[in-house]
Amino acid sequence: MKDVAAAAGVGLKTVSRVVNGEPGVSEETADRVHAAIRELGFRRNDGARLLRQGSRTSCVGLILEDLADPFYAQLSRAVEEVARSHGSLLFTGSSAEDPARERELTLDFCARRVDGLIVVPTAADHGFLAPELAAGTAVVSIDRPMNGLTVDTVLAANRRGAAEAVGHLIRQGHRRIGYLGDDPEIFTAAERLAGYRQAMAEAGHGVDEAWLAMGRPEPVGIHLALDRMLSGPDAVTALMCGNNRTTVAVLRSLATCPGRTALVGFDDFELADMLPVPVTVVAQDPMLMGRMAAELLFRRMRGERAQAQRLEIPTRLVLRGSGELPC
């Protein structure tokens, strides 16, 4: 705050009033203070007003892609259970796959002096968290690794799980297998696509790029992709879906299409076993991932200084019927 006061040419009390939204400061002076804050990158530390330096708040933060997603909902529940067992409160936010929102949430949590953070990364570079890490905030990455920051990381075996699913379809006699996945800029989407390509290559099968559809799981786009994949002499006979939202959108679209197409989805989802043709899936274990990430976080918060770990949690192929339809 001293630097802000000096840059704005005002006293510390004036800066404090502006930062805390108190009256008694002219608009022109407040503008100068805000300009200095932006230039210097100052952020109010709410906890510092209440706590002695070096004390703990017994609060941790969790930043997910979308709390409404069943996968992340289970992961959040597991983290919360571990936090509670350690006497800590969990704050949760959704980034909506927006790097700017992720950064804003992350730094807001840090400004409120959470003791640690578990983050599903979306940004291309997480170097902005280095000062927080150096200041003693524990950080763990989950579901995807962070770029520009070396921290404990908990992942699912995305590539291996996708390769196992495609290999299973190949063993049912399928050679032309379509793949529908999320934005390939997302780590999990890229890994699962790589697993698909790996399994096809290991079986000696080429991949026609027309068999691929990558992007956000929008119903219209998925329907158009399926029209392309399922028509013509080289139509695919089986489909691999890269996440649960894509699988659900594909199933809705297939309900209007004639024929029976084999399908395996990555991620389990509610009622997948209750459909007319139960859905074969690659099941992740979000509860285990959440527990392991949280335990790593609390070990760091207790002062553990060991080298950062990268843990990969195995997936499980659950055979239910849709992936066993023959060519």
Question: Which stretches of residues belong to each language-model region?
Answer:
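N-terminal helix-turn-helix/winged-helix DNA-binding helices
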Residues: 38-71, 75-77, 85-86, 108-111
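Flexible loop/hinge segments that line or gate small-molecule binding clefts
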Residues: 119-164, 185, 245, 267-279
